[in-house]
Amino acid sequence: MKAITTTQAKDHLDELINAVISDLEPTIVSNNQGQQAVLISLDEFNSWQETLYLLSNPTNAEHLMASIKQAETGQIIKQKLPDLLEL
């Protein structure tokens, strides 16, 4: 993860924003007092928020983890979208 100072961020803000978006890589920004914040793209932030929401419900989290385990062990069933819409 890239780390820069607030002065560097101010001097190159447009470039920094473009890099964070294109590289999908968060950047740590530190001020003179040693405080730090992280700059991420809005899409990445929204993705993290959605993941937190989905995993905040224990039942939903358990179902998602079981589904991931099934996919990793090849226990999947391929279906076409029209077939799923009929369910």
Swiss-Prot record:
**GO BP annotations listed:** regulation of DNA-templated transcription
- One annotated GO molecular function: sequence-specific DNA binding
For this protein, the record's InterPro entries field holds: Antitoxin_Phd/YefM, phD/YefM_antitoxin, YefM-like_sf
The keyword Signal belongs to this UniProt entry's keyword annotation: no
> Keyword set for this entry?
Toxin-antitoxin system
What family does this belong to? Belongs to the phD/YefM antitoxin family.
- Quaternary state and interactors: Forms a complex with YoeB which inhibits its toxin activity.
| Function summary | Antitoxin component of a type II toxin-antitoxin (TA) system. A probable antitoxin for the putative mRNA interferase YeoB.
Q: Extract the NCBIfam families matched here.
A: phd_fam
Q: What is this protein called?
A: Antitoxin YefM
